[in-house]
Amino acid sequence: MTGLLVRNLESYSRLAELGFSEKCVLDHSLYTWNDEAIHFWKNQKILRNTVPLELNEKELRHRENAGSEVIVYGRLPLMHSAQCVRKNTTGCNRQEDRLVLKDRYDKEFPVVCYCHPWKTGNTKPEGPCYNIIYNSLPYGLLKEADKVKALGVSAVRLSFTIESAGQTQQILEDFVAAYREGRVSREYEFTKGHFKRGAE
């Protein structure tokens, strides 16, 4: 095991108590927007932090990125919901499934249902379900490889969630070609998130 991806303070606190601070990689959900926050986490002896998704390229150039990794591909969650889409439409069948929500523009938003108690921390036989609703387009910085590398990050991350094995392999190969060889051979429809415009 080379690292543990940590998404909240509670998880970090527990891992630190167990002596795993130096294996912790903070996800983008933990605050590292400025150098003061980065230095705080360095003092905790974490392995790395993740570049905030809300900062744009210009803002990232002014951030200390040497101990950071950046997400260059992934389906980003739009919402975590305790209101199960399946339960509220056709009824819960306790099957972990994928659904699709369509908006008025016919954009499809993948929904993943999580139904098993061990995943929700509930030990009752019928625990609460929850859903993750993902953006209609994956986040991707394929053509921005040179700009990403110029930020001086220590690693790039591809975050696979709902992709098939074949899609995962193809995307991985294309990103390796772009980031190692500077070659983009395939067109994808990606959102760039805040990389170009930033959060307001």
List the predicted regions and their residue ranges.
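Active-site pocket-lining/capping segments in soluble small-molecule metabolic enzymes
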Residues: 1-200
